[in-house]
A protein has these predicted regions:
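Terminal RNA-binding accessory module
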Residues: 197, 205-251
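Conserved alpha-helical substructure of the radical SAM core
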Residues: 30-57, 78
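C-terminal, non-catalytic macromolecule-binding modules
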Residues: 153, 173, 177-221
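Short, small-residue-biased leader/transition segments that mark boundaries at the very start
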Residues: 2-7
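Aromatic/hydrophobic pocket-lining residues that form the small-molecule binding cavity
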Residues: 41, 76, 143, 175-178, ...
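Canonical Radical SAM [4Fe-4S] cluster-binding loop centered on the CxxxCxxC motif
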Residues: 8-39
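Conserved SAM/AdoMet-binding glycine-rich loop
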Residues: 50-172
Length: 251
């Protein structure tokens, strides 16, 4: 038991982003993706472990791309294996893009007990035309395959995603497709946001769904997600789970 600052820490392994999603301004603000060298990452991680950090939250705009700008190879799995040798209790991963989740990475997550089986994988949408318009490299079926592979190989996995309601090109048909996808894949956690155009992005130049309609769809998606989480919560009633105590209160 200790203070929150020494118990858990967000640990950035890269800066910037090279994904160029059509609705996102981050690449223009922060520049292209730049991985920190493994030597520097591990040196800082050792200091955090020695200081008493028990949960290390590995973050970047896209941690799955780690290392590809250094030598052209995905190095996240190798980095995680090294981090798991240090004195952390849990290692949590934010954020993974589905098209760069390799078999080696899945095996590493499944095999390393310190890696929390909770993966945050933002998909934005599932409709192929919308994904293509937003410069996403995924398709609905490629996303579905990644989710199925992860669930088949990682026991007790919980998935979280981020979804944008009312993206350009989303009509009622595409919206219902998104609702159905959520129901079918039973994604346990989801952050749902109405589309809001950002100046300087491709999406801002496209025809928009009216904001009030985007908000209505957001609320409907939240309802869908509430049903999914209720079902999940009922499925784990009676389970005994390990928790990390960050502090205590007189109350």
């Amino acid at each position: 038991v200790g203070s929150e600052m020494c118990i858990r820490d967000s640990f950035k392994i890269a800066e910037g982003c090279s994904n160029r999603c059509g609705s996102c301004i981050i690449p223009k603000l922060r520049g292209k993706y730049r991985s920190r060298t493994m030597e520097h990452v591990l040196a800082e991680a050792r200091q955090l472990a020695d200081s008493g950090v028990k949960e290390l939250i590995v973050i970047a705009q896209d941690i799955t791309r780690y290392g590809t700008d250094l030598n052209g190879e995905h190095q996240l799995a190798a980095l995680l294996r090294e981090l798991c040798k240090l004195d952390f209790h849990w290692i949590r991963l934010h954020y993974l893009y589905p098209d760069d989740i390799t078999d080696e990475l899945i095996d590493t997550i499944a095999q390393e007990e310190k890696i929390v089986p909770y993966l945050d994988i933002p998909i934005q949408h599932c409709n192929d035309d919308i994904l293509k318009a937003m410069n996403r490299r995924d398709t609905k079926e490629s996303i579905r395959k990644v989710f199925h592979d992860l669930r088949a190989r990682i026991p007790g996995l919980v998935l979280r995603t981020s979804i944008i309601a009312g993206l350009p090109g989303e009509g009622e048909k595409e919206f219902e497709e998104l609702c159905d996808f959520l129901r079918e894949e039973k994604i346990e956690r989801a952050g749902v946001f109405p589309f809001s155009p950002e100046e300087g992005t491709k999406a801002a130049t496209m025809e928009h769904v009216p904001m009030e309609e985007a908000q209505r769809r957001t609320e409907l998606l939240v309802d869908v997600q509430s049903d999914i989480i209720d079902e999940y919560n009922e499925s784990v009633l009676g389970d005994v789970r390990e928790v990390l105590c960050e502090g205590w209160s007189e109350e």
